[in-house]
Amino acid sequence: MAIRKYKPTTPGRRQSSVSMFEEITRSTPEKSLVRPLPKKGGRNVHGHITVRHKGGGHKRQYRLIDFRRNDKDGIPAKVAHIEYDPNRTANIALLHYVDGEKRYIIAPKGLQQGQMIESGVNADIKVGNNLPLRNIPAGTTIHCVELKPGAGAKLARSAGASIQLLGKAGKYAVLRMPSSEIRRVDIRCRATVGEVGNADQINIRWGKAGRMRWKGVRPTVRGVVMNPVDHPHGGGEGKTSGGRHPVSPWGKKEGRTRNPNRYSNNMIVQRRRTNKSKKR
């Protein structure tokens, strides 16, 4: 994916860039595979804000993506189109199966229009094919990996993401995640060969706040500049530090929220590297 940089004709254009969409072969989605996507604005059924910084944005239709592919084993499919999906960073591929059905999948890097792909234990190890981890050789780059057999892909689905299959031990496969974490996954789980395409998406410079509003992202305001009625850090004469340990607008302390005793922690072989753990 190529990135086009704008000339600084206006302050909003300066430093901004946009995708060239060279891989896209069709601009309108398959009508049978889209559903309405009503906007919530970050509110729940009571109208209370449960997720901040959401609201507005361009209208979207949700594309139904096949994250399982287990009911199409042994049925070849032709890549009809590579399409843009506003609901995710990766592009999507429209498949035409030989039995007449059409489905969307996440488009991996190198997948071409007209290419034939398939899924199942007898599928070849080539980009776009989906098969169980037990049938994939060690060292293969994969994406769209399941955490539980038959539950659908949960790992490595965003643009440019990939996982390396390091090896197999008993009933588990050992994976190196995009975060550098090494963890075990049931060997019956399925994965797609290759890495997710559209890797240059991370290099796009939005350039102005308005482009984020088009995406449905509202401004983020620090608590220390609010009034006391709006945030525990608000108020005070002049510029203050908040006067207490960092908390959310509802008083919950800042910090990690994952349960340290979560049942799946025993599947982690090696923790991901963080800034604190890196050698200086």
Swiss-Prot record:
Q: Which cysteines are joined by disulfide bonds?
A: none
Transmembrane segments in this chain: where? Answer: none
An example Gene Ontology molecular-function term: transferase activity
The processes (GO biological process) annotated in the record are: cytoplasmic translation
Q: Where is the signal peptide?
A: none
- Listed InterPro entries: NA-bd_OB-fold, Rib_uL2_dom2, Ribosomal_uL2, Ribosomal_uL2_bac/org-type, Ribosomal_uL2_C, Ribosomal_uL2_CS, Ribosomal_uL2_dom3, Ribosomal_uL2_RNA-bd_dom
Cellular component, GO, one term: large ribosomal subunit
Q: Does the keyword Translocase feature in the UniProt annotation? A: no
Which residue ranges are recorded for the region named Disordered? 1-47, 224-280
- Bias (Polar residues) occurs at 258-268
Q: Which Gene3D superfamilies match?
A: 2.30.30.30, Nucleic acid-binding proteins (2.40.50.140), Ribosomal protein L2, domain 3 (4.10.950.10)
Basic residues compositional bias: what residue ranges?
37-47, 270-280
Q: Mark out the compositionally biased spans (Basic and acidic residues).
A: 23-33
Q: Which domain of life is it from?
A: Bacteria
Q: Which UniProt keywords apply?
A: Ribonucleoprotein, Ribosomal protein, RNA-binding, rRNA-binding
Record function comment: One of the primary rRNA binding proteins. Required for association of the 30S and 50S subunits to form the 70S ribosome, for tRNA binding and peptide bond formation. It has been suggested to have peptidyltransferase activity; this is somewhat controversial. Makes several contacts with the 16S rRNA in the 70S ribosome.
Question: Assembly state and interactors?
Answer: Part of the 50S ribosomal subunit. Forms a bridge to the 30S subunit in the 70S ribosome.
Q: Which family does it belong to?
A: Belongs to the universal ribosomal protein uL2 family.
Name it. Large ribosomal subunit protein uL2
Q: State the organism named in the record.
A: Corynebacterium diphtheriae (strain ATCC 700971 / NCTC 13129 / Biotype gravis)
Lineage, broadest ranks: Bacteria, Bacillati, Actinomycetota, Actinomycetes, Mycobacteriales
Name of the encoding gene = rplB
